């Protein structure tokens, strides 16, 4: 009998939530075949069978929180239970009458045996088994509406209901009932996904544990847009990837971090860890909120290398295929609210990082060129949120001005590759 355990996923992850079982008790599974989907704080992970056999028992239901190393099921070796061998037929004609007379009680005996065996093999969720034990209910007698024939907790509750008072049933949904009583209009109570709960928790933690402050500036995007317009076809022919804005911003951020290294640091206890690498997180919209995959060693990548990496990570994020390693270890983050039409915002730090740059919508605005002349220019507000415990206002403003100057004269970025 092999145990199914929650594997170690990453240093920062100690637990997860079972999103769904992909196999049911009684199913035969091959080694390496997917068993279940586990939802963690960062990504969903599909766990596989470590050996072939029959999924014997599921100890944790979908929606249950499980710890790393916890046993959540078992797999029996081999191809499952085989039928008992048929009894050898007796050839003596004199015994045929005797066998005929014994047929009825024998059938009854086999039937009772089968019922007993069926009872012990009734497929049921752990919560259903627990409730059945507490109430003294025979699971083999409980009808279920599950298409796979699995007895669920609600099936046991429904089976028990006729013989008991309705009061216990009312206690089953205190949360939903409370929510409904809080409003005089119709509402819908939804359970937050594990990832959404984690996002909510961490955003509040950042506000409570850092001295977060935001400073703003604006960038004239004329030079970048003209450069893209002139070079986009040649760039695509040479690199088979489009030249976007993110590579310009990533290059500018790396250059600014080299000039202001405290924005590439983090606090650990009473020590300040200043990072000498440039792993830039790029916020990407996914179904359950933003995820921040990391572009590794962005200082060593060309414009094409950055665009390709961001494109691949964004595609994985949309398809929920990001690995934990692709989400960990960033030193600074860039987020682009402009893709959704945001004109200005104050991005929240991606802890333990101490800086995040917010990009916004490019909008034509009249700009004074000199005392007598105005021109409509494509302008973008940029925002830097930073941890004031480490970074002073002078450094924060200098960092943002450096990015502004580089983007308004992008030839400087091209000199860096």
Swiss-Prot record:
GO terms for cellular component: cytosol; oxoglutarate dehydrogenase complex. It catalyses: N(6)-[(R)-dihydrolipoyl]-L-lysyl-[protein] + succinyl-CoA = N(6)-[(R)-S(8)-succinyldihydrolipoyl]-L-lysyl-[protein] + CoA. Its EC number is 2.3.1.61. E2 component of the 2-oxoglutarate dehydrogenase (OGDH) complex which catalyzes the second step in the conversion of 2-oxoglutarate to succinyl-CoA and CO(2). The modification N6-lipoyllysine is found at residue 42. The keyword Acyltransferase applies. Residues 75-191 are annotated as: Disordered. Belongs to the 2-oxoacid dehydrogenase family. Residues 164-182 have a biased composition (Low complexity). InterPro entries: 2-oxoA_DH_lipoyl-BS, 2-oxoacid_dehydrogenase, 2-oxoacid_DH_actylTfrase, Biotin_lipoyl, CAT-like_dom_sf, E3-bd_dom_sf, PSBD, Single_hybrid_motif. This is Dihydrolipoyllysine-residue succinyltransferase component of 2-oxoglutarate dehydrogenase complex. Residues 89-103, 152-163 have a biased composition (Basic and acidic residues). Pathway: Amino-acid degradation; L-lysine degradation via saccharopine pathway; glutaryl-CoA from L-lysine: step 6/6. The lineage of its organism: Bacteria, Bacillati, Bacillota, Bacilli, Bacillales. Its cofactor is (R)-lipoate. The active site is at 388, 392. It comes from Bacillus subtilis (strain 168). GO terms for molecular function: dihydrolipoyllysine-residue succinyltransferase activity. Signal peptide: none annotated. Residues 1-76 form the Lipoyl-binding domain. Keywords: Acyltransferase, Lipoyl, Transferase, Tricarboxylic acid cycle. Residues 123-160 form the Peripheral subunit-binding (PSBD) domain. One of its GO terms (biological process) is L-lysine catabolic process to acetyl-CoA via saccharopine. Binds 1 lipoyl cofactor covalently. Forms a 24-polypeptide structural core with octahedral symmetry. Part of the 2-oxoglutarate dehydrogenase (OGDH) complex composed of E1 (2-oxoglutarate dehydrogenase), E2 (dihydrolipoamide succinyltransferase) and E3 (dihydrolipoamide dehydrogenase); the complex contains multiple copies of the three enzymatic components (E1, E2 and E3).
